[in-house]
Structures are given as structure tokens and as C-alpha cells.
Amino acid sequence: MSGRNRSRSGTPSPKVTFKQESDGSDSESERRNGNRNGARPKNNNSRGSAPKPEKPKAAPPQNVSWFAPLVQTGKAELRFPRGEGVPVSQGVDSTYEHGYWLRTQRSFQKGGKQVLANPRWYFYYTGTGRFGDLRFGTKNPDIVWVGQEGANINRLGDMGTRNPSNDGAIPVQLAGGIPKGFYAEGRGSRGNSRSSSRNSSRASSRGNSRASSRGASPGRPAANPSTEPWMAYLVQKLERLESQVSGTKPATKNPVQVTKNEAAANAKKLRHKRTAHKGSGVTVNYGRRGPGDLEGNFGDREMIKLGTDDPRFAAAAQMAPNVSSFLFMSHLSTRDEDDALWLHYKGAIKLPKDDPNYEQWTKILAENLNAYKDFPPTEPKKDKKKKEETAQDTVIFEDASTGTDQTVVKVWVKDQDAQTDDEWLGGDETVYEDEDDRPKTQRRHKKRGSTASRVTIADPTNAGAERS
């Protein structure tokens, strides 16, 4: 028995089995020296030894977001209503749910030309990321500041940033849904496939290192992968490819169509319970714009026509109070009439100038507030054009010179004082050297009248006397 199987003093001998016994050259000293010099041991069987846990790698020098990006596919920039825009996360207190979306764009070579890829937007909590030193609301063309209701922008959390060597990106989920013209990268990405291929010992080691290194992190939301926006985007792409192969057009969402019954039902609602949209505009539901106490003074011509379907409405709605604020912030008074009780309200809304949407609000107010004063005056409906006071009558008489019947077209002509400018100019008496120089309208008129004699009768009632 070789000496390597003897137990050392105070140390129990490990039970190790080998498929093949090494030859005489494979001595303990050579194996020890070879391992010290970094050489690979000759015995390749390592099943008996426990694998060493992998040490977590240090964070990279750049700042990496906890969340996967939103990819912009449309022309509209990223915008969120007030109180929305922070990704849904676990382990983050609502006080710290505020941050910014950073716009990035890469380029690549295609056909010898530089092509820009779709812009990508990454979310960072306030105080983290590339612009971690900026105060909330600081203006930057590549940044959109967002914050949830109840968040305190003056308090910063300890979420930090992500180490991509230890953690995969979290797919973005928004309470209000992904904005139109964007899709969220997420499930089925490199991070998940990599983590599923790791063995249990490495996963447990990495999990322990996460808990000790990152502290309070957003965590992974427990959601069904089939409900992710990324899967919905893939389904949409597959449907589009299928339609291209079959030659059929993909089914598109029909615009909202309001039937007469729906419009009538909307009209039966109380005015403050109606909703104006493209099929039922502002004027139909709330009346004309004007200076009266019961007349609205907000909305330009486009906003009045489209109502809530106007692309600016979402930003304008951020200025409007919710139900609770309306009831408890307004100064209310009543006025009793025979058929109804009128509830009057008066109040004010504060729009902070340091809000990132302040400039957009002021622009919307400038375009829509009292815009009715610049509306063109309404033109009265025009009556149908009166028929021209001309009449034609065709008679047959015998031409004395030829002895044959000749068609005569009698044209009743207006008096010169009653003729319009166009009618007066139409009677051009200019003598042209060449007939082709005459205007085409007159040449066509002459051609039509070439088969009949033209007789002008001043008094239609005395046609017989004038012809004789």
C-alpha cells in the first residue's frame, strides 16, 4: 500500500478511489511539486474532491443599470404621466422610487455605411449611474426624470448599480404599461440562460455573495414569463412574418368608432361625467368655448376636435386634479334653481417651476388657454347658387334662302347691367387675325353652334314679332 493512503497524525484519511493506479514515476513529491508550479496533475479524475466556490468578481468600472433597457422603435420620445415611469421592483422602499431614464444610441457598420441602432433607454435610481451627481429634475436632453406617487426626491436609497458578472438585468415592468413605440428587452436573454446553466454549488455561492455585496437591490419580480412584454413583442413579430409569407395583411386595430346609440348614450350623461374624444368632440359634450361662467375656455381647434385622443392630452391631464384633490381643494358653493342644484367650484393648482415637465405644461397652456379668441368667425351657411338666368329654346323655321328647315337656338341674354364680371368678360368681341388665337372656350362654343343659327332675342314674349 502506498504511503499516500496512510493517515497523518490527527487527520482522518479521506476515502478516495481511482480508476487506474499510477506508475512509479507518479510520486507524491512530483505531484506536489507539479501542483505548486501550476502544472496540471496527471490524474484527471477529480470527482472525489469538492469544487471550490467561485469568488464574486469585482464590479466593472462603468455603471450598469439594474434593469434591461426599453428599446425605442417609434419617433416619439420617452414620456410618462406624472407619478409613473419607475419600473416595478421588489425590495425598494416607495420613498426611494424616483430616478431617471438615460437615452443611449449605438452605431454599426452596414454595407460600408455607418448606421444608427434604435435608441435604448436605461433606468437609474436618483444618485446612481452615469449622472448620479445630478439633482432630481436637472435638465438634460438625454434624461427623463420620473417618480412614483409618495416618493421623496430629497432622500436617496442604497440600491447602487448592478455588477453584470454576478447579476442579470431585470426586465422592465411598468404599472401603466410600456409606452407606445417602445418594447422592453427581458426574458430569454443572456442573463437567464447563463444562470440556468450554472451548477448548484456555484449558484449558491453566487447567491451568498450577492446578499453580502449589494445590500438592498431591486430584486427580481416574480412574474410569469409568458406575460412579459418581450413575449408579446415576439408574438407580434411572428404574426407579422406569417402574414408576409402568406401574403395577407396583418390585422390592424380599428380606430374607435362611435355609433349613434353610443353617442346618444354619452349625450344623456351629465356634463361632468362625459368623455370627449375623436368620435364625440368637446363642443358636442361641453358646448362652445367662451368667456361665460359656464363656458369652458381651454382647447384649441385641434384639441376641441380630438378631445382625449389629442396627443397632447396625456401631458395636459397631469395638470388636472384627481377626485380627492378636486373635492378637498376647491371652494364650493351652491345655487338652487327650479330644475336642478348647481354646484360651483373655484380653486387653483400649483405647477412647480423645477418640475421636469414645466416647460411642456406652459407650452400646452399657451396653445389652449383662451384659444377660442383667435378662432375665425363662423360663416353663415351659404344658400345654393342660383341657377343662371338663361334659358334656351329651339324652334324650327323655313329658311327663305335655301327653302329648307333651319334650327334656331334662342338664347335669353341678361341685361348688361345685370351681368356679372365673368359673364361680361365671357362676351369677348375681340377680332382675332387667326381663329386659332381665340380662347379655347370660345372656339368650342363656336364649334357647338356651327350647326345652328344664333339669334339673340331681347324680349322673349315678343319672339314671333322679332323673328318676322
Curated annotation (Swiss-Prot):
Residues 18-33, 379-390 have a biased composition (Basic and acidic residues). Residues 419-436 have a biased composition (Acidic residues). The keyword Transcription applies. Keywords: ADP-ribosylation, Host Golgi apparatus, Phosphoprotein, Ribonucleoprotein, RNA-binding, Transcription, Transcription regulation, Viral nucleoprotein, Virion. The modification Phosphoserine is found at S165. It comes from the Viruses. Residues 1-64, 181-228, 373-399, 419-468 are annotated as: Disordered. Residues 62-186 form the CoV N NTD domain. The modification Phosphothreonine is found at T451. Belongs to the betacoronavirus nucleocapsid protein family. Homooligomer. Both monomeric and oligomeric forms interact with RNA. Interacts with protein M. Interacts with NSP3; this interaction serves to tether the genome to the newly translated replicase-transcriptase complex at a very early stage of infection. This is Nucleoprotein. It comes from Bat coronavirus HKU9. The lineage of its organism: Viruses, Riboviria, Orthornavirae, Pisuviricota, Pisoniviricetes. The gene is N.
